[in-house]
Regions:
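Short histidine-centered beta-strand/loop micro-motifs
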Residues: 17, 36-42, 58, 83-84
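Short acidic-glycine-tyrosine-enriched beta hairpin
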Residues: 60-77
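Short, conserved beta-strand element in jelly-roll/cupin
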Residues: 41-56
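A short, N-terminal "cap"/entry segment at the start of jelly-roll beta-barrel domains
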Residues: 1-29, 38
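A cytosolic small-molecule/anion-sensing beta-strand core signal
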Residues: 51-52, 68, 86
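Ligand-binding loop in jelly-roll beta-barrel domains
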Residues: 76-96
């Protein structure tokens, strides 16, 4: 799990950056307060870039709080979970 504090919170800039890095299946997602995703994996490398709110992400190595402007890169097949208490909006992308 790699986290970068980019300071970028503009959706359009985030999407263009991910496109330039070869990510596809790029979309915007928002979760309401109290949303929880149990342990799961993704087949491909994944990115989650928060532009509003905050989310807690956990792996077998621990957990982190992602806030506005934070980018999380997850290698393919990384077992993880996520929850938000306040609500969050982020840009998602995948790379094969």
């Amino acid at each position: 799990m790699k986290i970068k504090k980019t300071g970028i919170t503009n959706k359009e800039k985030i999407i263009k950056k991910l496109e330039s890095e070869g990510f596809d299946n790029i979309f915007v997602w928002c979760d309401n307060p109290g949303t929880f995703y149990d342990w799961h994996t993704h087949q491909y490398q994944e990115v989650r870039w928060v532009y509003k709110g905050e989310i807690i992400m956990g792996t077998e190595d621990g957990e982190v709080i992602l806030t506005e402007g934070d980018r999380l890169d997850l290698p393919a097949n990384t077992k993880h979970w996520a929850k938000t208490q306040r609500g969050v909006c982020y840009v998602c992308g995948s790379k094969k």
